[in-house]
Regions:
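Metal-dependent phosphoester/phosphodiester hydrolase catalytic core
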Residues: 53, 186-219
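N-terminal, active-site-proximal structural segment of metallo-dependent hydrolase catalytic domains
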Residues: 27-115, 121, 125-137, 320-323, ...
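Beta-strand-turn-beta hairpins that frame and shape the catalytic cleft
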Residues: 30-37, 46, 145-147, 174-200, ...
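Active-site environment of divalent metal-dependent phosphoester hydrolases
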Residues: 104-106, 132, 201-203, 240-246
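Bacterial Sec-dependent N-terminal signal peptides
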Residues: 1-32
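Metal-dependent phosphoester-hydrolase catalytic domains
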Residues: 29, 222-233, 241-367
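Structured beta-strand-rich core segments of catalytic domains in phosphoester-bond hydrolases
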Residues: 102-190
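Active-site metal-binding loops of divalent metal-dependent hydrolases
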Residues: 42, 102, 198, 238-239
Length: 367
């Protein structure tokens, strides 16, 4: 009985979100000039080789997923197909695309060389991180539009006033993804892009860990804003939290409207979308937006003649400044998970899908 009620509730949420997605996709076919900044969780993009010291055995040919070269090639093709579809939809490739759940630089090199997206000439920023499974974050960028000045991997630490559930001994053993920061130039303006994959949800636990990750990203952002007045910053990633959770609102200072922003706050274009019922993934029977991109005041509001955030969807008097990219081929078409992202594995079986997340993006321009 409980299972049936959950399934019924899930179907209701799916119908609502499909209606919303239909509106978004129909309304956002043509976007204005400018640069596209996006994020995509690639859902376990592993190669077929063991990385020393990492627990990647599940994604080996003799592992539990029987992760063969054919499956890996299929996965690469699928990821490139989505990136190409976004480019076809928008009339151009992303300038910046943050990614998560990638095993190493090698898989990104294989991805950007796929024929579907090779003409974008994406370049890569990546650092090997301490995650026990070996999953990292990375950044793809177009060198004709973005010039890298600096990049670094920011480690996760517990040096905070947050009260953690983990004991000091457990904190010593804790490993998660580093945060990637890439600073550079678009036209004559300085930017910094942060790519995050905050600690996963483990039942009701982990809120403090994600709050700390958000706090780290915020603290480094503020340092950059003070060091480089006027710098434009975007913090993106799989936050494993919704836009209205404490990690985003309290620790990353995410605000729903630009009018609410202080000089060191961030505008979260996905907060109003989340409240309106949109989702980038289905988690425990509910639609969530974990794939979030926040921008600082300099990027949100801008100045005359300079790049700033642009609306992607307008409905009556309301404008949405973020977009969740969804297409039928990326969506489960039947079965109990109909209407949700079409993932690589389902119930332990390889189904050859794309990702359990939809990609998200924003647009910056001058109009």
């Amino acid at each position: 009985m409980v299972v049936k009620l959950i399934e019924k509730a899930m179907r209701k949420h799916i119908l609502i979100i499909l209606a919303l997605f239909s509106f978004v996709c129909a309304s956002a076919q043509k976007i204005g000039p400018g640069y596209i900044i996006g994020f995509y969780n690639l859902e376990n993009l592993f190669d077929t080789y063991h990385d020393e010291g990492k627990n990647d055995y599940q994604y080996l040919p003799d592992g539990s997923n029987n992760w063969t070269e054919a499956k890996y090639e299929k996965k690469l093709h699928n990821m490139a197909t989505v990136i190409r579809a976004m480019a076809d939809d928008n009339g151009r490739f992303h300038t910046i695309l943050g990614v998560s759940e990638i095993e190493n630089r090698h898989v990104l090199e294989d991805l950007v060389s796929q024929p579907e997206i090779a003409d974008a000439n994406f370049q890569i920023v990546h650092y090997d991180g301490p995650d026990r499974r070996g999953v990292d974050v990375g950044l793809l960028y177009r060198p004709d539009q973005f010039t890298v000045l600096e990049s670094r991997s920011i480690p996760y630490t517990f040096d905070s006033e947050i009260v953690f559930e983990l004991t000091p001994e457990e904190q010593e053993q804790f490993r998660t993804r580093d945060i990637l920061m890439v600073r550079g130039m678009i036209e004559d303006e300085m930017y910094a892009f942060f790519v995050c994959h905050l600690p996963s949800r483990l039942g009701s636990k982990g809120n403090d860990l994600r709050s700390r990750g958000a706090e780290i990203a915020y603290q480094v952002s503020v340092e950059l804003m003070r060091q480089y007045p006027g710098i434009k910053i975007a913090v993106m990633g799989d936050m494993n939290d919704n836009p209205d959770n404490d990690s985003m609102v309290i620790y990353l200072h995410g605000r729903e409207t630009m009018e609410e922003m202080g000089p060191e706050d961030f505008f979260d274009p996905f907060l109003s979308m989340f409240k309106a019922g949109y989702g980038s993934l289905a988690y425990q029977g509910e639609w969530c937006i974990f794939d979030i991109i926040l921008v600082n005041e300099a990027l949100a509001k801008g100045t005359s003649g300079k790049l700033r955030l642009q609306p992607l969807v307008k409905k009556r008097k309301k404008a949405f400044y973020g977009r969740i990219f969804q297409r039928d081929f990326m969506t489960q078409q039947d079965g109990p998970y109909k209407g949700t992202p079409f993932r690589t594995y389902s119930s332990g079986a390889f189904v050859g899908g794309y990702s359990d997340h939809y990609p998200t993006y924003i647009l910056i321009g001058k109009k």
